[in-house]
C-alpha cells in the first residue's frame, strides 16, 4: 500500500505492506531512513533549510524545515523501535529548478543544511543524489528497505542499502 508523503510532510511505518513515496523533489529534499533489523522506515519531504526563517510556521509544521523535520523523522522512527546505529539514509533533491540564475539557491542551501545536521549528529548518509536541475521521486518499501529513485530524464534506479 503506497503512503504518499507530500511537501512539508513525513511518514514513518513498520507495516511491511507499506511503501512510502514522495514525488517531484525539486529544490526540496527527501530524506529516507530505514532500520533493516527492526524493519522500520521513514520518509521526510522538507522545503527549507532553517526554521529560523519562520519560527511560527516551524511550530505549526516542523516538516517544512531541515533543522526541525530531520530530528522529528528520527524521533518518530525511534518511537517505533529503530536504533540510530542501524539506520541507513538516502538523501535526494536539492535541485535548482525555478531559480536558474541562482539568486536564492534554495536547493543548495537545503543540501548544505542536511549534510550539516547529519554530520553534527554522527549519522552517515549512505546514498546521496542531489543538485542539478531535475526532479526526483523516492520510494521506500518497508518490508525489505528497497529504495528506488526516479530521476526526470534518467529513469528509475534501485538503491540497495542492506
Give the residues covered by each predicted segment.
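Active-site microenvironment for binding and transforming phosphate-containing groups
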Residues: 1-162
